[in-house]
Amino acid sequence: GPLIRLFDETFGLEDARSLELRLTVTGDDGCKLTGVNSVGSLSRGFEDLVSAAHGRHHQYPDGFVLFTGTLFAPTEDRDAAGLGFTHHLGDVVMIANDHLGALRNTVGRSEDLPAWDYGIRTLFADIGAGQR
């Protein structure tokens, strides 16, 4: 599901820049990868990314979402030497930060997983109703 953090008087750009995100991949085969990403290490700052995405050249009257990505790219071999890393079905992937919480997903085939019917309208309706 989505992970959204809105800026307000308790959380601003400097807070976002100082975040460290932990990533963990755990497999049924005993595989465990961990990594830490420092948002401050991104190659382009938030203001630079926003200025490239918004202006007369790209107009979004209703706003937009800025996805900054992650610095984590596993290079360890998983199944055989020289083949690199690939997810297996059942892998549990978690991205977490003490301030933001955690996003946890299990790798599966889309056609075999429950339908993702919780969309943006329901999310914002729940936010408006004070549900979490």
Set out the residue ranges of the language-model regions.
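Generic secondary-structure signature for well-ordered alpha-helical cores
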Residues: 28, 55-58, 98
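Glycine-enriched loop-and-adjacent helix/strand subsegments that border the catalytic/binding cleft
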Residues: 1-50, 120-131
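Active-site proximal loops enriched in glycine and acidic residues that flank catalytic Cys/His/Asp
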Residues: 25-27, 36, 64, 69-70, ...
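Charged, cofactor-coupling segments
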Residues: 2-3, 8, 76-132
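Extended hydrophobic-aromatic, low-complexity segments
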Residues: 32-35, 58, 104-106
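A conserved acidic, glycine/proline-rich C-terminal tail/linker
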Residues: 48-87
